[in-house]
């Protein structure tokens, strides 16, 4: 079966995440070790539609394992959501002689992989998003780096907030999921952590926590907010109006996506890239590479996207204890 796969493509789609380059590097070198050619598709699914590609060899991916972002660029494609766009992408695969595609990205990327596989193209997905919100995997490439970046920024903010005895409200990314906020909040010892999985209640989740901290003798407070829960600006305004404090609001934004990936992200990305090539070489399609209890395995994309993911309840319980909930 392996000899049937002669040429594959690799692309990154959706939001970038630290470690994507490590995954690209692994895909290229793993494929070459099997005698499989690799084509890099630039700018995600739109690049596949447009035939925007580059031939890749081992030197193409030299010295990129430590780089953030993605050397293949990334983009979102409205055209690929249409049947006409998907047909164009499938035709490009055939014109380029591709026997399969490795797609690196989030849940939107995986839905694109689902769609493309219906046109007879073998596709394997690798989860890459700082949100860690893909239902079928314990871990997504980029999460550890983003969390460490957020922690470093908040630690720096806390230094100045302590000096001025102020309250700080920090908004982190995560879209509709609170994994990043929860993890970061635990790491920085936040006064309160607001996540979209819990309905926002200012009095219970913020005001009471600040009052408790005051009783403990604290004079500065750190509120970590997931972007999908409530606006950090709104929280800041409520603190000012109802508690009489003068909070400083910081939205970390896209800085969380950048920077050199951590060792964890580099290693997991490398292992996932290797596994994706193995699955394609053995005839797999419509598959996604996932982590389960520190093991790298593959599963059906349809089954993976149908799963429901909730916050880590153990971490959530620890957070509640740490913040006095």
Residue ranges and their predicted role:
Residues 1-2, 48-101, 108-109, 141-148, ...:
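Glycine-rich oxoanion-binding loops at beta->alpha junctions
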Residues 2-49:
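N-terminal phosphate-binding or glycine-rich loops at protein starts, especially the Walker A/P-loop
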Residues 13-16, 41-47, 76-77, 106-108, ...:
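Short, ordered loop/turn segments at secondary-structure junctions
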Residues 22-27, 108-121, 181:
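Short Gly/Thr/Asp-enriched flexible loops that form oxyanion-binding sites at enzyme active sites
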Residues 29-56, 119-156:
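Glycine/threonine-rich beta-strand-loop-alpha-helix active-site module
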Residues 103-105, 115, 122, 143-246, ...:
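Accessory alpha-helical/coil subdomains and C-terminal extensions
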Residues 231, 239-325:
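C-terminal non-catalytic interaction/assembly regions of soluble proteins
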């Amino acid at each position: 079966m392996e000899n049937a796969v002669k040429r594959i493509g690799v692309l990154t789609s959706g939001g970038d995440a630290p470690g994507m380059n490590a995954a690209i590097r692994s895909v290229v070198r793993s494929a070459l070790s099997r005698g499989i050619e690799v084509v890099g598709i630039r700018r995600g699914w739109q690049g596949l539609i447009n035939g925007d590609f580059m031939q890749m060899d081992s030197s193409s991916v030299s010295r990129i394992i430590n780089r953030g972002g993605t050397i293949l660029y990334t983009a979102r494609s409205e055209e690929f959501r249409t049947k006409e766009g998907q047909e164009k992408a499938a035709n490009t695969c055939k014109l380029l002689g591709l026997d399969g595609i490795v797609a690196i990205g989030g849940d939107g990327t995986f839905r694109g992989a689902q769609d493309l596989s219906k046109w007879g193209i073998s596709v394997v997905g690798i989860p890459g998003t700082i949100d860690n919100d893909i239902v079928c995997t314990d871990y997504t490439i980029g999460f550890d780096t983003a969390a460490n970046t957020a922690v470093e920024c908040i630690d720096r903010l806390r230094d100045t907030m302590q000096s001025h005895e102020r309250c700080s409200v920090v908004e982190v990314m995560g879209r509709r999921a609170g994994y990043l906020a929860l993890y970061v909040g635990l790491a920085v010892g936040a006064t309160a952590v607001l996540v979209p999985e819990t309905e926002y209640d200012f009095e219970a989740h913020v005001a009471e926590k600040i009052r408790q901290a005051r009783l403990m003798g604290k004079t500065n407070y750190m509120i970590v907010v997931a972007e999908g829960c409530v606006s950090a600006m709104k929280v800041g305004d409520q603190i000012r109006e109802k508690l009489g404090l003068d909070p400083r609001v910081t939205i970390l934004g896209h800085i969380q996506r950048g920077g050199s990936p951590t060792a964890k992200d580099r290693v997991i990305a490398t292992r996932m890239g290797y596994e994706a090539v193995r699955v394609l070489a053995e005839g797999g399609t419509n598959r996604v590479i996932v982590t389960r209890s520190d093991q790298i395995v593959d599963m059906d994309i349809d089954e993976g996207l149908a799963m429901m993911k909730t916050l880590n309840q153990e971490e959530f319980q620890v957070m509640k204890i740490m913040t006095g909930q």
